[in-house]
Amino acid sequence: MAEYIIYVGQIEEYQMLNDRQSLDAIFRKAQSAVVGGEVVALVRQNANGTEYRFEEISTLEDLNVYKKNVYKYVKEA
């Protein structure tokens, strides 16, 4: 099964920078993946380079819940 990977460290970096444009692009791709029947994997990359997959999103409802949580920490422009 195909999947789209979201690296959570990258999401956190964009949150700190208030980079809505980059976050929007990631979530557009994730939404397309879910609509196309793919799974969205949330992955954290450790300092030593190993990856830890801690959640999989397969529905638009779950993706929107995660997206809302992410944007909660982004300041309005």
Give residue ranges: language-model regions.
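Short aromatic-glycine-(Arg/Gly/Cys) micro-motifs in beta-strand/loop hairpins
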Residues: 1-14
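Intrinsically disordered, low-complexity boundary segments flanking structured domains
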Residues: 3-4, 26-30, 59
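A short, exposed loop/beta-hairpin motif centered on an aromatic-Gly-Thr core
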Residues: 11-24
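A short, charged, amphipathic alpha-helix used as a generic interaction element across diverse proteins
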Residues: 21-41
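Short, mixed-charge low-complexity intrinsically disordered segments
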Residues: 35-77
